[in-house]
């Protein structure tokens, strides 16, 4: 799970009719020509091409409140820079200042969200209101108002994805850094619109963070307790999925628990779940009959899940008028953020979902299980090194090893050395990662200033760390290590990070895959582990690939039905989930109209994030092959330090070839 810093209380429900009309650029061609003429008269004809590009970039974002055409022309003539020394000086100054501004504001944001993100006690109404405060929402607006952004737009080019794919291979690191800096001003979004987006994501995130199911209160079809441990509290969807995974190899009792969890998931996505069973240890619930024990009425949850998603949709849709080159959130996520066209991502996922290797693997899984596949077997965990070990056994190991947050913090150097990082590098990393007690399942929150530290949020109960929490924490640690390298050891701050979220997920997966090894419980040979890794990665990509297609389909539907009500979105989501299942899963599982692909919480709180997980599995497999050929720690550092190039350039630098699922399919074969 990537840091939720960007998914941070209730957005304004803005319908099409209530969206405020955006201010529009007001500069005509004559004013642009006059600006170019003034610049070339001052700096020479050799600067005409740069002058025209810069003047046009400014004009495209110059609103009436910025001044009339005369003011625009004067600004361009007065602020155009020529010569390498002047341009380098301006870039260096901007890069230095932006690191400090963005970094300090992130630290403020982290502090404001502390009561909601961390398990520090009850969350008050004041805490919730403070969580709505996002000072960073106004930064770029202020940079436009003060014309700092216009100075940058006048002097440095804004590149498109097409530009980078065409010319990026020949660019220097300086050119890449300048190009990345200018991404922040490619769009001009008013602060109030950005604030609404922040509030919508915060509301969705906090809704999900409190969505626990009391497994110890679940009843089976016969009305009897299913035997989950007392106090077992599972957040949706992460813990539900991981609890389900943990019961393979436990015979009929494990199978009964898995079927119950699937039924819980179905009740959640259909919004048939009785509202009062959510995080309530005082009542029992039979998800098969949907009856609640304890007396009293038990009305269903009133489509809150889909209302939160609509709030997110309407908030991000309000950005559309300010993004002429990417006028939908879908386009912005794929072309600006992910930097891989939507159609290309879909094609890549379908290549896995329809591959003969998946069908062959399904037969292998059926053989291992000794029964026909059931829908929840999309989360089959029998290829992991923990197969055959009970959840209770693993919990006892992790509780003893990591009884507190402080103990996990103290163990970071040894964990990192166990992964293959040199002692001095393990110490360097441990000093830059802070472990916090998470209120939710856990996440990684990176820094934006090299003097700051990244934060690993992990959920450790008073009785000690459970295996599920440990598994998530090792994944999040992978994010933190990537964040530490891609910020702390980058040559240009403007290049900090990785091309998109899929890449940090990929690097985190390489940590998570070794969780049992770090506990000293990996007993298979290296060859056997590699084979199981290929099977697990292929099956995991098959599962999350379908989930991603549902996520993408839901966003397309919302854009086609912008005035939809929560109940309509619920029915559309379920229909899309059934359609994807029937096309790519029913032929293998032999069951139609299954809806559990819609259970992922990311669909509600993270806005089209799920395709990054699918891409992450594919990237992780390609990267892991390189890591095996050398020192894991050294290779991880090498690839992470490349920074925020295009996905294609990053992959070629990391593994010597483009992003492709073929390596995964070949290995599984």
Which residues does each predicted region cover?
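Positively charged n-region of N-terminal signal peptides that target proteins for export
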Residues: 1-5
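Bacterial N-terminal signal peptides
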Residues: 7-16
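Boundary at the C-terminal end of the N-terminal hydrophobic targeting segment
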Residues: 18-22
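C-terminal, non-catalytic "cap/extension" segments appended to globular domains
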Residues: 23-259, 263-291, 319-389, 562-669
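Active-site-adjacent bridging/hinge elements
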Residues: 234-240, 382-388, 444-456, 477-489, ...
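Post-HExxH zinc-binding segment in Zn-dependent metallohydrolases
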Residues: 314-318, 485-489, 493-539, 616, ...
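Auxiliary, metal-adjacent structural segments of Zn-dependent hydrolase domains
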Residues: 390-452
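Active-site recognition of the HExxH zinc-binding catalytic motif
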Residues: 456-487, 508-509
């Amino acid at each position: 799970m990537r840091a939720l810093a960007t998914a941070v209380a209730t957005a304004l429900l803005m319908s099409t009719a209530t969206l405020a009309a955006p201010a529009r650029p007001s500069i005509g061609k004559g004013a642009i020509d006059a600006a170019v003429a003034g610049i070339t008269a001052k700096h020479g004809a050799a600067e005409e091409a740069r002058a025209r590009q810069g003047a046009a970039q400014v004009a495209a974002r110059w609103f009436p409140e910025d001044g009339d055409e005369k003011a625009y022309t004067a600004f361009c003539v007065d602020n155009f820079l020529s010569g390498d020394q002047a341009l380098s000086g301006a870039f260096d100054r901007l890069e230095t200042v932006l690191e400090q501004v963005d970094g300090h504001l992130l630290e403020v944001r982290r502090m404001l969200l502390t009561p909601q993100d961390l398990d520090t006690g009850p969350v008050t109404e004041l805490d919730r209101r403070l969580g709505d405060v996002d000072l960073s929402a106004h930064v770029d607006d202020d940079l436009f108002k003060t014309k700092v952004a216009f100075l940058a737009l006048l002097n440095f080019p804004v590149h498109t994805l097409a530009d980078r794919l065409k010319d990026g291979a020949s660019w220097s690191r300086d050119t890449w850094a300048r190009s990345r800096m200018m991404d922040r001003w490619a769009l001009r979004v008013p602060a109030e619109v950005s604030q609404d987006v922040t509030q919508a994501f915060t509301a969705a995130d906090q809704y999900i963070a409190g969505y626990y199911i009391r497994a110890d209160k679940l009843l089976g079809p016969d009305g009897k307790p299913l035997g989950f441990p007392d106090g077992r509290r599972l957040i949706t969807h992460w813990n539900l999925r991981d609890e389900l995974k943990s019961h393979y190899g436990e015979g009929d009792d494990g199978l009964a628990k898995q079927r119950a969890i699937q039924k819980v998931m179905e009740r959640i996505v259909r919004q048939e779940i009785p509202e009062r069973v959510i995080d309530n240890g005082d009542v029992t619930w039979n998800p098969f009959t949907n009856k609640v024990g304890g007396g009293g009425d038990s009305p269903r949850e009133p489509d809150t899940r889909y209302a939160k998603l609509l709030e997110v949709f309407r908030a991000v849709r309000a950005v559309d008028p300010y993004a002429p080159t990417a006028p939908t959130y879908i386009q912005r996520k794929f072309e600006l953020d992910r930097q891989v066209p939507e159609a290309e991502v879909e094609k890549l996922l379908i290549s896995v979902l329809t591959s003969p290797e998946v069908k062959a693997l399904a037969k292998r899984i059926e053989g291992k299980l000794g029964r026909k596949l059931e829908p929840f077997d999309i989360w089959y965990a029998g290829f992991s090194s923990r197969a055959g070990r009970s959840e209770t056994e693993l919990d006892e190991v992790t509780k003893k090893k990591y009884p507190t947050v402080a103990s996990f913090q103290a163990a970071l150097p040894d964990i990192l050395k166990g992964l293959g990082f040199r002692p001095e590098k393990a110490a360097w990393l441990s000093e830059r990662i802070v472990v916090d007690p998470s209120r939710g399942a856990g996440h990684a929150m990176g820094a934006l200033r090299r003097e700051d530290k990244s934060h690993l949020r992990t959920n450790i109960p008073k009785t000690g760390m459970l295996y599920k929490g440990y598994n998530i924490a090792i994944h999040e640690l992978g994010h933190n290590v990537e964040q530490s390298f891609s910020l702390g050891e980058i040559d240009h701050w403007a290049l900090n990070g990785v091309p998109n979220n899929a890449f940090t997920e990929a690097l985190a997966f390489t940590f998570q895959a070794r969780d049992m090894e770090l506990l000293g419980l990996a007993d298979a040979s290296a060859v056997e582990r590699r084979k199981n890794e290929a099977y697990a990665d292929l099956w995991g990509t098959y599962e999350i690939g379908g989930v991603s297609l549902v996520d993408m389909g839901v966003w397309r539907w919302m854009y086609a039905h912008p005035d939809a009500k929560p109940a309509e979105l619920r029915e559309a989501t379920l229909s899309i989930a059934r359609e994807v299942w029937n096309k790519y899963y029913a032929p293998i599982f032999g069951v139609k109209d299954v809806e559990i692909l819609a259970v992922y919480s990311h669909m509600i709180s993270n806005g089209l994030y799920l395709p990054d997980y699918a891409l992450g599995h594919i990237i992780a497999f390609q990267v892991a092959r390189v890591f095996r050929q050398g020192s894991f720690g050294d290779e991880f550092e090498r690839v992470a330090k490349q920074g925020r190039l295009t996905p294609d350039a990053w992959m070629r630098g990391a593994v010597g070839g483009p992003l492709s699922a073929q390596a995964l399919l070949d290995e599984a074969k």
